[in-house]
A protein has these predicted regions:
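ATP-dependent adenylation/nucleotidyltransferase module used to activate substrates
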Residues: 2-171, 233, 251-262, 266, ...
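Beta-strand/loop nucleic-acid-binding surfaces
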Residues: 62, 244-247
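Small/polar glycine-rich anion-binding or flexible loop at a beta-alpha turn
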Residues: 221-232, 268-273
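A short interface-forming secondary-structure element
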Residues: 228-245
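Short glycine/threonine-rich loop-to-helix capping motif typified by GTGT followed
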Residues: 193-200, 243, 275-278
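Charged helix-capping and loop-helix junction motifs
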Residues: 201, 248-249
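Mid-to-C-terminal catalytic subdomains of enzymes
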Residues: 156-160, 166-221, 228-229
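Short secondary-structure capping/turn micro-motifs that flank functional sites
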Residues: 66, 94-96, 184-186, 226-227, ...
Length: 278
């Protein structure tokens, strides 16, 4: 009997390819532009399609406390390999790009990006492409109002969801530049009004350490315990790494307690919908 291979996502893939072709053609009309390039999977996928369309792209990376070192390294590797001009602007101000998770008084993230671009005299007149999903654009509109006129949102305007970005990222094998690190680091905190720079750094370093131990998809959540009880690191592992994590829990505990965490717990349960999303 002949073996039959059933392609489960054939219809989705065909629709996706047609939309992807439109997304390649749309930015091409601008000739050259600046892309907000954080190294997140959305920005890597957007950069890939702009390059495919022959657009001359410049990468603007705002190196702020909420950008993980792994994503920054991925952005550098990508630009270096493809010979792209990248300017990394260092700032101690936190760039909260997720409009669904903003602390009171948080600045408009596009304002920070625009200020950084404005300091680059030869880039100031170029349009700024925002590699955001439809969900992110809707959240931005709800929080900050109309989109700035000098920005381009082709992916959101084509209805690209976060799921679509992830599909395109893996379809084009962009994880060869480094595994995704679970999105914005501010998602590792429950109370954003109390978030501090050194706490974000602790989380980022802990996730890097776990990646070096073989847990490259681990997420570390920060929980202040109050008083003299210090801070708790809650480690969440994907299903396929939980058994290995259980076997090495003592190594994990020792490693993270050496990073100023007072308590460490390994979360082996499947996250519920109301928990923090990574």
């Amino acid at each position: 009997m002949d073996t039959k291979i059933v392609v489960l996502n054939q219809g989705y893939d065909q629709t996706f390819q047609a939309r992807e072709q439109r997304l390649i053609e749309t930015p091409a009309g601008h000739g050259e532009l600046v892309i907000s390039f954080s190294g997140r999977l959305e920005s890597c996928y957007a950069m890939e399609l702009c390059r495919a369309g022959g657009v001359r792209v410049r990468a603007l990376t705002l190196d702020n406390p909420l950008l993980s070192r792994r994503e920054l390294a991925r952005a550098r590797r990508y630009c270096l390999h493809h010979g792209l001009e990248q300017r990394v602007i260092k700032t101690e101000e936190m760039l909260f790009c997720d409009a669904n998770q903003l602390p009171p008084g948080a600045r408009d993230p596009l304002q920070l990006l625009d200020e950084a671009r404005g300091r680059q005299a030869d880039w100031a007149a170029l349009p700024l492409l925002i590699p955001a999903s439809l969900e992110e654009m809707q959240a931005y509109l709800g929080r900050f109002g109309p989109l700035p006129g000098h920005t381009l949102w082709p992916f959101a305007e084509q209805g690209m969801s976060h799921r679509d970005f992830r599909y395109g990222f893996h379809r084009r094998e962009l994880d060869r530049w480094g595994k995704t690190s679970g999105g914005y680091l501010n998602r590792r905190f429950q109370d954003l009004s109390q978030i501090q720079g050194h706490q974000v750094q602790m989380i980022d370093m802990a996730e890097q350490l776990l990646a070096d131990m073989g847990f490259d998809e681990a997420q570390v959540f920060f929980h202040p315990l109050g008083g003299e009880h210090g801070a708790l690191a809650r480690i969440r592992l994907p299903a396929h790494q939980r058994a290995h994590g259980f076997d090495r829990q003592q190594d994990i505990y020792r490693a993270l307690k050496g990073m100023a965490f007072d308590h460490v717990t390994l979360d082996l349960a499947q996250p519920r919908r109301h928990e923090i999303k990574g």
